[in-house]
């Protein structure tokens, strides 16, 4: 099982073209809700745990990505390694009539090889079945010196 895990990481595409959202604003595309339950920026690692979902759309088919956006290259985003987390509390907390339990995520990023610069943390959610896509720039800023 471990070998499979490492193969997935080996072929992980770290960049995401977000030029469709230019000019980049705080809220881009379809609006959605999100929350960071945990955000830690340590010496080498950024960890983010939380949830994100579109209103009134089952989260089962939504893909969630946590991104780093360099202020000098705002149309190219660096993806975190993001895994889905089951969060039945999100459906209850939002008093939703649709299942939002697949809206949870856990993300980590090793920032040792990041070029110097200022990076904003962004949340990207896409649901191809419902043709919805959105990107939100958060208030989280990472400075690499």
Model-derived features: positions:
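Basic, ligand-binding patches in group-transfer machinery
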Residues: 2-145
């Amino acid at each position: 099982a471990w070998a499979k895990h490492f193969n997935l990481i080996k072929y992980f595409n770290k960049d995401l073209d977000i030029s469709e959202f230019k000019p980049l604003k705080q809220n881009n595309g379809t609006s959605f809700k999100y929350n960071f339950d945990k955000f830690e920026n340590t010496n080498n690692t950024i960890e983010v745990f939380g949830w994100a979902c579109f209103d009134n759309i089952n989260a089962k088919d939504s893909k969630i990505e946590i991104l780093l956006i360099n202020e000098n290259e705002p149309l190219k985003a660096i993806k975190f390694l993001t895994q889905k987390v089951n969060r039945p509390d999100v459906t209850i907390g939002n008093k939703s009539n649709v299942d939002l339990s697949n809206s949870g995520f856990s993300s980590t990023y090793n920032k040792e090889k990041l070029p110097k610069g200022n990076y904003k943390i962004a949340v990207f959610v896409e649901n191809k079945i419902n043709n919805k896509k959105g990107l939100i720039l958060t208030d989280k800023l990472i400075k690499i010196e």
